Amino acid sequence: MAVKKYSPITPARRFMTSQDYSQLSKVEPEKSLLQSKSKNGGRNSYGRITVRHHGGGNRQKYRVIDFKRDKDGIKAKVATIEYDPNRTANIALLNYADGEKRYILAPVGLKVGDFVESGESSDIRTGNALPLANIPVGSMIHNIELKPGKGGQMVRAAGNAAQLMAKEGEYAQIRLPSGEVRMVRINCRATLGQIGNIEHENVKIGKAGRKRWMGVRPTVRGVVMNPVDHPHGGGEGKSPIGRPSPVTPWGKPTLGYKTRKKKKKSDKYIVKRRNQK
C-alpha cells in the first residue's frame, strides 16, 4: 500500500503520513471471528498501574487469527483482505471448501480470489503453510512455530520475513529479521512468503493526538519528576540525573543494560546472535 502525504495546513500535518487503504476490501469484519476487548488503562485488579503509558484509545474488537494453520488438505479461497487494528499486518479472510471461515496474516502478493492450503503435501506457493521439512532451503517464510502444533510465534509483524538457511537432522536453521540465526524443530510449521503491508515502517505519526487514538499515553522524563517519583528526579533547576548511569523508575540499570538471563535454556538453539558480525 502507498504512503499518503498531507498539505501542511497545520504544524502536525506537515510531517504526518498515513497509508492508502483503498486496496483493502470495503466490508465489515466477519462477526463469528470477533471477540470483545476490555480496556484496563494499564491497571491490575487492585487498580494500580502495572504498565505505564496505557489508557484511552479507540474501541476495538479482537480478530481471531489462525496462527496454527492446522486445517490440512482442504483448500480455502481468499474472500477479503482487511485492516486489523490489533496488529501492523493486514489479515485475509479464508472461506474453506467445507464452509468454515478463518483469518490469517496476509502475505505480500495474496489477492482476493486466490486459493491457499496447509499440510505436508501443499504446493510451494505464497500463503501456504507447511512443516519446515517440506519447505525448500532459501525460501522466505513467516508465522513460524517454536513448538510443533502450538501455532506461529515468530515473524508476524508487517513487512517481516525469515529465511530458511539449512536443515540438519531434527532441526532447521532460520535467519530471523533481526539477523539472528536460530534452530527450530523441523516438524514445526511456517507460512511461505513475506508479511504484507511493507510500507508500515514509513508511516510517521505526526502528532500526539494520533498516538492517543492508539491508546498510548505520554512518556515523561524522570529528570523532570520529583525524587519521590523517579530516581532521576529532584534538584534545583535543570540538573543532571546525579548517577553514574541511567536507571528505571524502580532503580534498575537501563539504556544498554543486558536484561536477558545469563543461562537461558533456549540459548542452545541460537546459532548466531543478532549483533554478532
From Swiss-Prot:
Pfam families, per database record: Ribosomal_L2, Ribosomal_L2_C
Record's keyword terms, sorted: Ribonucleoprotein, Ribosomal protein, RNA-binding, rRNA-binding
Top-level lineage group: Bacteria
Gene Ontology cellular component terms for the protein in this record: large ribosomal subunit
Subunit structure and binding partners: Part of the 50S ribosomal subunit. Forms a bridge to the 30S subunit in the 70S ribosome.
Entries under SMART domains matching the protein: Ribosomal_L2 (SM01383), Ribosomal_L2_C (SM01382)
Functional note: One of the primary rRNA binding proteins. Required for association of the 30S and 50S subunits to form the 70S ribosome, for tRNA binding and peptide bond formation. It has been suggested to have peptidyltransferase activity; this is somewhat controversial. Makes several contacts with the 16S rRNA in the 70S ribosome.
Annotated stretches, region: Disordered: 20-54, 223-277
GO BP terms in the entry: cytoplasmic translation
Compositionally biased region (Polar residues): 33-43
Originating gene: rplB
HAMAP family: Ribosomal_uL2_B (MF_01320_B)
Gene Ontology molecular function: any one: structural constituent of ribosome
NCBIfam families: rplB_bact (TIGR01171)
UniProt similarity note: Belongs to the universal ribosomal protein uL2 family.
Compositional bias (Basic residues): 258-277
InterPro entries: NA-bd_OB-fold (IPR012340), Rib_uL2_dom2 (IPR014722), Ribosomal_uL2 (IPR002171), Ribosomal_uL2_bac/org-type (IPR005880), Ribosomal_uL2_C (IPR022669), Ribosomal_uL2_CS (IPR022671), Ribosomal_uL2_dom3 (IPR014726), Ribosomal_uL2_RNA-bd_dom (IPR022666)
Protein name, per record: Large ribosomal subunit protein uL2
